[in-house]
Amino acid sequence: MGARFSRIAKRFLPKSKVRILMVGLDGSGKTTILYKLKLGEVVTTVPTIGFNLETVEYKGINFTVWDIGGQEKIRKLWRHYFQNAQGLIFVVDSSDSERLSEARNELHRILTDNELEGACVLVFANKQDSRNALPVAEVANKLGLHSLSKRCWLIQGTSAISGQGLYEGLEWLSTTIPNKPERSTSVSSFRSDSYERKLVRGPRY
């Protein structure tokens, strides 16, 4: 009886709202990921000129996800969306090793912006279903993630087509992003390298 009442009550409780910015190089699969999370299916996409905005509900949290185009000429506009972002999803194509240095430069460039100082960083190492996909640990090294010693981050292997790893990423965001602005963001030293080609964790706030 009590459990049933609890389930009913949750339907009427206000949902937490979290603002997420999703960026990455063009062709990394950002928009496919967004609509896989939103609709549960793969949709036909075209290169994003501007942005896509959708709300994804997960475990009582409304994630407002801003998917920003990744073409080089658009990247200088990313900073206009940084304000009030509580989480950053950075999507990389694990199968395109030639562009990982470019992705690294863009990631570290935007993380110097004060507007993203408190944002948790979730890296989706996408296209893990590709024959040419690099192991997640190698992607993490090429992106220089272990140098982000003062920031909360996680890299998650994903496939936008099958949905592999996407909800694991949302789970991490839902348990990591502070629900209240005044909550402390001090670092507690934590890192686990048991990833099985899927997961590499950074320090947990």
Curated annotation (Swiss-Prot):
Domain of life: Eukaryota
Record NCBIfam families: small_GTP
Main location: Golgi
Protein name: Probable ADP-ribosylation factor At2g15310
InterPro entries: P-loop_NTPase, Small_GTP-bd, Small_GTPase_ARF, Small_GTPase_ARF/SAR
Species of origin: Arabidopsis thaliana (Mouse-ear cress)
Gene3D superfamilies reported for this sequence: P-loop containing nucleotide triphosphate hydrolases
PANTHER family cross-referenced by the UniProt entry: ADP RIBOSYLATION FACTOR-RELATED
